[in-house]
Structure formats: structure tokens, C-alpha cells
Amino acid sequence: MGNRIVIIGAGGHGKVVCDAILSQNEYVINGFVDANVPVGETVINNYQVIAHQDNLEALKTQVDFFIVAIGNNKIREQVFNLAKTILQPATVIHSSAVIGSEVKIGEGTVVLAYSVINASARVGENVIVNARTVIDHDCIIGNHVHLSIGTMVGSNSTVDDFTTSLIGQKMDSFSKI
């Protein structure tokens, strides 16, 4: 298996996910998948849309990994579940992020610029940890969550599946949302 990746979603979130992938220097971006943009159209950083979601099967020989760059949690879950029947989900961590010891990060999760995930935290599958988010030690973040820019999750807190935080939202230690 190689390191070729496709980004599913060519909107605003796709831009920051693309930047995170480029910062990692781990994957080779083959292009984007987007249901609302014609195949062949150049969209972000001179990458083209190479398929629509309903034609992911055609990418099996061109791409090894995928990452979903769609902000809506429910839609992101649906696309993630479909895509992982065909391709391998990637985990994308921006090079400026800080990841503590014994942290577990699920498949399909994106950790964006200047975020911090402290020791023994667990982050589920297909999660957006947006820029400058802090997840303190021993937190549990569910699946298909979107922690918006600047969210601060205090130690030993739990964030349930499908939760979306507000920009700059703060959760005290031992909280549950």
C-alpha cells in the first residue's frame, strides 16, 4: 500500500485539511472528491476534483487513503462510512499540533494547526479537532465530533458522539456534553 490520499470535500474545510496534509509530508495528495464540483475542475492548491462520492470505487487503483473534509457531522459520518468500505481512512495531524503520551486518535480524524491533545486522551473516529483546540489529559472525545476553533476541553471530560462545539467554547474539567 502506498501513501496516496484523496480529500473528500472541496469547500472551506477542504482547504485547511489540504494544508494539514501538506504540512505532514506523509501523504501524496491525488486530488479531491466533491459531489458539487465537476470532475476535472481545479479547486484548491491546483488540485483537481478526480471523482464524485458515488464513484469512489473507481479510485481503488489511484488512491490508498481518504480523509473526509466536510464540517456537518451527520453528512461526514455517512461519507466516512461509505468511503471506508472502499478505501483506507487516514488520520491527519498538522505538523504544528502537540500530541501527548498515550493519546489514542481514531481513524479518519483531523487534528488541525496548533492544537494540543494531552496525555491519555482518547479521540474517536472521523473527528475534527479544529485549529488551536486544547483537549486536556484523560478526556474522551466521541466519534464524528466537531471541536470548533479554539475549543478548550478540561481534563477528564467526555464529549459525546456527533457533538459540535462553539468557537472558543470552554468545558470545565470533569464535564460531559
Residue map of PLM features:
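Hydrophobic, well-ordered beta-alpha structural blocks that scaffold small-molecule cofactor pockets
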Residues: 1-44, 50, 57-60
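Generic structural signal for conserved hydrophobic packing positions in ordered secondary structure
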Residues: 9, 66, 89, 136-137
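Alpha-helical elements of the RecA-like P-loop NTPase motor core of helicases
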Residues: 15, 19, 77, 143
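Short, glycine/charged-enriched secondary-structure capping and boundary segments
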Residues: 21-23, 45-48, 80-83, 106, ...
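Conserved acidic residues
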Residues: 30, 64, 107
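Phosphate-bearing ligand-interacting subdomains
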Residues: 37-98
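Structural signal for interior beta-strand "rungs" in well-ordered beta-sheet cores
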Residues: 91-177
